[in-house]
């Protein structure tokens, strides 16, 4: 029975070394070119069986492994939790997975999230315990770990430290999550126990062990799943849309099932539905090369079979979006393929809110991942689209901000900002957050939201009438009316220019027109304990409806008193709270309503 390459998914926490580990296998350097050192798009690499046998020759006899698979196809799935949706897609495509964990740091939130994804997809996995070279005293060298793990090559203290970190940082956590796990050389039953393979992406130690274990497990337990479908049409997922010299727009894709031929029809999803286009060329990357960053030209193929990474040349691909499902079929199966693809596209629809922000991304998967991560921090999303930031986006965001300043935001993941959009942003109140790492964008969103909420709260408090109690000082009446001028002491709260003043029996007396400090300079407010001359314009006549030693109050409208009492009480000083409390008690008595302001 002919077998296809098993599809291997690589998952793990950010910076635990997923792509670096693959680099060691491929002898390439993709990680250094990625934003923030974090892999941001699913990549695909074919590792042929001859390469696996070559680097693992010392182990094949030891493990009695007779490998008959043609090789492995690795999906380099992004490691940060922000890419949950892409990892789910990667996990779903994968036959088996490698979970990369730093043996020195142990499990992180993204590690646990990755395990949950693998559980959901029912994908078997092994653990690559990376960075073994950083264990104090460890003598790490390229080659099999199992041949280096002995007292001849390692100091006893280093071996003890290795055992401690292996158990405390990896095996114990797997046990807590319901998995039996052990060092791969000690595993008796691979159907019940997770294999933990120590590796070093820096030195290459353990890479042969990893390749033998992953290949052997895939072949042993997934043989039926790996049976090559020589009759069926090809099914796949779009990785990227790329411009290639001499070819125009092309699609990079992973084919995970079936056969495709030059001259077949490509059926692929886009934002408006489905595109059908006749294939001009199927191009394969040279073995051991990374699809999104090849160092050499692709080679043409008349026919390809799963599982493989492929570049597809065909007309009318401009509107294809990364992450879209695709089928490659003969002409008589186009209609059936269209129905299948449409169903998959509909699953990617992002639900939007009645109000909220705008998010844009470069791919369907990135957009979905960004939306999912923003939802986790309770973001409201009004519009979610793939594509560059346009002037229209900015105008829309500005209109959203008119009802709520928190909606005046555009978040852009890995997209361009068009020139007219930049000009529009400069003259608008719209905030733009740009980035190539989703979790950082989410962090920036949270920071911006917090700052905006504090600013909005501060603005709202400043617009509210602040409570205050004042006392007319004896021998300090300078003018009786129009306006009345006298000296007052602020007993509680904050007296501001424009504050409406009332007497203890609830009569309106006027509003504060002017205040001066001890230097006779005009001031806008006076706080508790201050004695200041004030002018009050209105019905007040000093000596008649207001006298020396009288207690006067700033009249706070009931809706504002209620807001201060319920929403902003923690923002008030102690004396302001006292002023508000006394004022509310007075109003409840005057209005004969114990619920006034409550």
UniProtKB/Swiss-Prot annotation:
Keywords: GTP-binding, Initiation factor, Nucleotide-binding, Protein biosynthesis. GTP binds at residues 12-19, 76-80, 130-133. InterPro entries: EFTU-type, P-loop_NTPase, Small_GTP-bd, T_Tr_GTP-bd_dom, TF_aIF-2_arc, TIF_IF2, TIF_IF2_dom3, TIF_IF2_dom3_sf. Pfam families: GTP_EFTU (PF00009), GTP_EFTU_D4 (PF14578), IF-2 (PF11987). GO terms for molecular function: GTP binding; GTPase activity; translation initiation factor activity. GO terms for cellular component: cytoplasm. Residues 76-79 are annotated as: G3. HAMAP family: IF_2_A. Belongs to the TRAFAC class translation factor GTPase superfamily. Classic translation factor GTPase family. IF-2 subfamily. PANTHER family: EUKARYOTIC TRANSLATION INITIATION FACTOR 5B, TRANSLATION INITIATION FACTOR IF-2-RELATED. This is Probable translation initiation factor IF-2. It comes from Methanococcus maripaludis (strain C5 / ATCC BAA-1333). The lineage of its organism: Archaea, Methanobacteriati, Methanobacteriota, Methanomada group, Methanococci. The gene is infB.
